[in-house]
Structures are given as structure tokens and as C-alpha cells.
């Protein structure tokens, strides 16, 4: 009897990798291989940008069938499906202007194959350190140097929910996701 399950989707942080050990257990790798032997396609589904996934995926001896990255804004499969939905440039400019006038706020900008921060502070360092070996490299860049020539898929300011709502309210096509 064949299985009705055709695909399985797995998050990286806290699902495939432990928040404690920052590694993928052997039992998880074996389970992923068992799914593939049953012709179940195995996908990564993450809020991470593709450029931030390699530090984890390179340690997992599994060939994934595709990724759903950036909370669904970037999807690709080995079969050639490619879906990309960047943030409207006008909204990126509004958020960038807000961030430039709030110099205490750190934000991560995610492009399809590059991620960077507008600045660094102690809170960012603590968050990144909590990821252990699964933490991607931190690059610092002035967003104004990139947003006009590179599509931005996600901007993650390190703010509370009320400030997030304020920022999203200034934009026409943006909503906060936590």
C-alpha cells in the first residue's frame, strides 16, 4: 500500500537542530532518509534566508528536495520550481528611513543569497551566540548601498510588537511575523 504522504517539511532551528546542542541527531537523519526511501519529498521550511541555511544544511547528510525560505517568500526545488516574492521597494525604503532615524535599532536585511545587518549591538550578539555553531556569519552593511540594486525579501528589526506594528503601519504591503 502506498503512502498518501508526498512531502514533509521541516524547520531548522529547534526542530532539526536542537537549541541546546545545535546539532541534528543521528535519529533525525535516519528518519529523513527513511522518508526518502518511501518516496516522500523532504523540504526545509524556515524563516531563515537561503544564505543563512548553509551553515546548518552543510552538516546534514541529506539531499533535500527544496526549500521554503524567508517564511515563504523564497521557494525553490531541485526540480526547477523557483518562486520569489520580495518586499515592495517603496516599503523597503520606508523601513530603511525609519531605521536610519532610530539608530539604536538593529535590523537584519535578507536578500535571496545574502543577509546583513544595519549595525550590531549587544542584544544581537547575545541572540547570535545562542545559535551556537548554527549561527551564520554576521555582515554589517549600509542598506542604502544595496536596496536599490538587490531585492530585499525580509527585514527583521529587533523591536517589540508595538514598534513592529508601527513600522508595518507605515507600509502598504508589509506585516509583521514572529
Model-predicted segments: where are they?
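Conserved acidic, metal-coordinating active-site core of Asp-based
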Residues: 105-106, 110-178
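A short acidic/small-residue loop/turn micro-motif
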Residues: 24-26
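Short amphipathic alpha-helices and their capping/turn segments at secondary-structure boundaries
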Residues: 1-3, 54-59, 170
Amino acid at each position: 500500500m502506498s503512502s498518501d504522504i508526498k512531502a514533509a517539511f521541516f524547520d531548522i532551528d529547534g526542530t532539526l537542530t536542537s537549541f541546546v546542542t545545535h546539532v541534528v541527531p543521528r535519529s533525525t537523519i535516519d528518519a529523513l532518509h527513511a522518508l526518502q526511501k518511501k518516496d516522500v519529498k523532504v523540504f526545509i521550511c524556515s524563516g531563515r534566508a537561503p544564505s543563512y541555511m548553509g551553515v546548518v544544511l552543510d552538516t546534514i547528510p541529506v539531499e533535500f528536495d527544496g526549500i521554503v525560505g524567508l517564511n515563504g517568500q523564497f521557494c525553490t526545488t531541485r526540480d526547477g520550481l523557483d518562486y520569489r516574492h520580495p518586499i515592495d521597494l517603496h516599503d523597503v525604503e520606508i523601513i530603511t528611513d525609519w531605521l536610519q532615524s532610530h539608530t539604536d535599532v538593529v535590523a537584519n536585511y535578507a536578500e535571496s543569497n545574502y543577509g546583513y545587518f544595519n549595525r550590531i549591538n549587544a542584544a544581537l550578539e547575545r541572540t547570535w551566540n545562542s545559535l551556537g555553531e548554527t549561527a551564520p556569519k554576521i555582515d554589517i552593511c549600509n542598506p542604502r548601498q544595496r536596496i536599490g540594486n538587490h531585492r530585499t525579501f525580509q527585514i527583521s528589526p529587533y523591536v517589540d510588537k508595538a514598534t513592529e506594528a508601527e513600522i508595518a503601519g507605515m507600509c502598504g504591503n508589509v506585516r509583521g511575523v514572529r
